[in-house]
Amino acid sequence: IVLYTYILYDVDELMYREEFMNIICFGDSITRGYDVREGLGWVELCSAALPAYHMENHGIDGLSVQGLINYLESWCIDKSYEENRYICIMCGTNDILQNRDSDYVYNKLIKAATIAGEKGHVILGLETQIDSEMDGLNHVVVDVNRRLQDYALEHGLQTIDFYTVLHEADQIGQIVFAGEVHPNERGYRLMAYKALETFTRL
């Protein structure tokens, strides 16, 4: 799998920039890379494509948005703000599957983003769809993502639209999910392509 085509900078310039880039990814099993072999999740694919970046994957299976807040609070205790640190957060599917509404999920994610913003630049990942509109829950994902995009625009934050890249592939008949929630190898690869569009332009 070659993802280097997304590195569009002059090579010398990019390598100079890479040496100072720290990208820390927090989220649930979709961030961790559930349902594919080790190394084939989107974070690991990005890390392989950007070998001079320092990237960390803090994805946790089953993580809720409150769990994300708790984890971030613990992680942040001994950290100071760093200009070269980018903190990517994506979470919410597990709460939506437990019938939490969009207000609950959105407000918790904004709290998480506020905590993360005290330690670095925040990137908001837009959660992927709940495939096949299981129990009508996907509309909650769409609403949360829309509100996150509005918040990011208002506050000058970057987003990674994982939802659209998988939804569009799904709509044209590509198989990008391993089940109702988790992407398959192709899905994670598309997510990595999308993330690299942002990461290579930081």
Enumerate the predicted regions with their spans:
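Serine-esterase "nucleophile elbow" of acetyl-processing enzymes
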Residues: V11-D61, V65-Q66, Y71-E83
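Intrinsically disordered, low-complexity segments enriched in small/polar residues
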Residues: V2-I7, L14, P51, N84, ...
